[in-house]
Amino acid sequence: MSTIENFDAHTPMMQQYLKLKAQHPEILLFYRMGDFYELFYDDAKRASQLLDISLTKRGASAGEPIPMAGIPYHAVENYLAKLVNQGESVAICEQIGDPATSKGPVERKVVRIVTPGTISDEALLQERQDNLLAAIWQDSKGFGYATLDISSGRFRLSEPADRETMAAELQRTNPAELLYAEDFAEMSLIEGRRGLRRRPLWEFEIDTARQQLNLQFGTRDLVGFGVENAPRGLCAAGCLLQYAKDTQRTTLPHIRSITMERQQDSIIMDAATRRNLEITQNLAGGAENTLASVLDCTVTPMGSRMLKRWLHMPVRDTRVLLERQQTIGALQDFTAELQPVLRQVGDLERILARLALRTARPRDLARMRHAFQQLPELRAQLENVDSAPVQALREKMGEFAELRDLLERAIIDTPPVLVRDGGVIASGYNEELDEWRALADGATDYLERLEVRERERTGLDTLKVGFNAVHGYYIQISRGQSHLAPINYMRRQTLKNAERYIIPELKEYEDKVLTSKGKALALEKQLYEELFDLLLPHLEALQQSASALAELDVLVNLAERAYTLNYTCPTFIDKPGIRITEGRHPVVEQVLNEPFIANPLNLSPQRRMLIITGPNMGGKSTYMRQTALIALMAYIGSYVPAQKVEIGPIDRIFTRVGAADDLASGRSTFMVEMTETANILHNATEYSLVLMDEIGRGTSTYDGLSLAWACAENLANKIKALTLFATHYFELTQLPEKMEGVANVHLDALEHGDTIAFMHSVQDGAASKSYGLAVAALAGVPKEVIKRARQKLRELESISPNAAATQVDGTQMSLLSVPEETSPAVEALENLDPDSLTPRQALEWIYRLKSLV
């Protein structure tokens, strides 16, 4: 904002603007003036750049021209969407006074603040993604983290113990807006994130947080929510709730509870694992060819969002998982009937949030009515499903016959977008409204009669009666006949080819009609607000219904996917281990144009590490990732792509697969690789599933091999995690001979002339060849380069059978094996004392050593 020294020098309107802007200095202020939202000074300059709109000037105030930009009020949603997507927040200032009775500027106030994390408008949200507001707090004992989805009322908190866990939570939740304390120490953790908001320390005070939360939930303490002993999480939650209330400028009745998310309740995946497994986002940042893209054929947006939450938080409670499995099995015969009906339910969850915020639009209520109309048919279909969990969902979804009847009587079939447009409340719902409408709607008949009468009376055949929003009712006569207008016709408007007049009788009728229209619209708005009052007492039951419908959508979807994609129900076992028969990669098998080669896997305490060798493009990474994805799918309760699966307890999934430079943090590829490896070695347990791909390739051969060997030893002997260890260091294939619990498997290929065929089939034992030059040729490396490489390979192999790491056989020398017998020359040198030699003796020793070499 430009500094204005003399406040009194401004016009009254600009004084009002400056007072409001001073209350919201950090964000854009949309200041309502008639049919436009105006922005002034620095706000105008910023908005013109962000929105690509014209920057103009509005006269002068305090002797200086005022930069100004404006947007039409009817198009505000489009502009808000653009700003929110760029991480901006906007204060919406409306006229609340009556211009007709106002002395000086019309009274205005900020009615809501639109921020990236607190939006609930349908036009601003991505319907199949959660939109989270989050707050982060840190003290000497760790982090506190809270998230709120204001569009559903879902409120969660957690207490990540360390930086890695906090980073994983940030990646999992991906908040649209993140609040942090002004003294937050770990800025490198959040730098570069969208929607960062620095907040004062007092907003994170624990006593204030407890008071805020108890007030919100109507409780005396927080014991019932299981969060009483989570002080760091509560500090974050208190700040977050206060911010939500400040921005919405209303109560938040749909936020009725808070849930503690504990690490031990779900399978932990760090940020690298979520990225590498491409659960909901591929490595390029898109949604194509991800696990969610294959599994998500849900028919409601709220079901899609729930499925993605399941995928990012696999549960460890086998009772929950067995219940989901049983439900999926029971629903498989009913998917074709249930999905078309569920599709009609729509996004009831977000509609209810807008109802709670009293921002629901007429079409929201029409959609709610349509959702209620599906419930009897859904309940009838589910009655035939022999499953206790399904029947529990059926009860939770309710029927709401009274509310359905209310909305059928109150709202017309296809209402307009906004209640201010009128025509929302159905005829017959309110007698007084019908009377005012009859008076207003009778205008058409009256005008037709008046036009016929005046034409006959004046004899003017061009005379017609009309209406426009600016000038009201008028009698129009062509320019050629205007000189014949009767004396009682008073000119109202001159056009190029016509004149428009008013007569006392028409003016009287206009006042009467406009009064009736105004009163009808005012009454309609009042009745619309009263509908909120009738619906809101049922909010808790309605939210339970929406949650049950979303869960039903997810389970019906997983049943359909299991049947369509030939998935099988996995079996949970008590001991650590994974046994897969004919396993397939859920994503790769969908994008291949040829049959996917299924492969087995056997991991157990006695066979806890597989050393995987084979050519590049042979399928090692696919084999590893498919194992992790099958485990992940099993732990959301889904069926899995395999013939048979037995899976034991898993506490964490780690992946060290691929790497790139992290230039923003100044970390090389190798540094990124080692950081991820360190995280695995510090945090993995015997119940963890670990994928290690090409450890050590970012440094010299000897360094890399040494690190890979030591990491493999540590994982197999000390941690005893279930590990898939892919490598091109063929020396590692000797590990099974040196330690218990390690086995070799490989993926083979066949060479024929200059071509290579990858078999993609996993076999026991180590690979016999790396096929690196064949893959290079396949990639299009020039023939002369390949030819030279073959020559160099033969040279290296003649020097050391191990130098090229191409052939593996019984005679291969390990880089890490004991050295051969020391040469005579070296032995002679070791026994020699140079200080005791005479010059002649030294010369003789040189000749003698020469003969020994």
UniProtKB/Swiss-Prot annotation:
Q: A GO CC term?
A: cytosol
Which residues, if any, are the signal sequence? none
Positions with a binding annotation for ATP: G614, P615, N616, M617, G618, G619, K620, S621
Question: Taxonomically, which superkingdom?
Answer: Bacteria
Keywords from UniProt, A to Z, are:
ATP-binding, DNA damage, DNA repair, DNA-binding, Nucleotide-binding
The Gene Ontology biological process terms listed for this entry are: mismatch repair
Keyword Flavoprotein: yes or no?
Answer: no
* GO terms of molecular function: ATP binding; ATP-dependent DNA damage sensor activity; damaged DNA binding; mismatched DNA binding
Show the PANTHER family listed in the entry: DNA MISMATCH REPAIR PROTEIN MSH1, MITOCHONDRIAL, DNA MISMATCH REPAIR PROTEIN MUTS FAMILY MEMBER
Q: What does this protein do?
A: This protein is involved in the repair of mismatches in DNA. It is possible that it carries out the mismatch recognition step. This protein has a weak ATPase activity.
Q: Which family does it belong to?
A: Belongs to the DNA mismatch repair MutS family.
Q: What is this protein called?
A: DNA mismatch repair protein MutS
Q: Which organism is it from?
A: Escherichia coli O6:H1 (strain CFT073 / ATCC 700928 / UPEC)
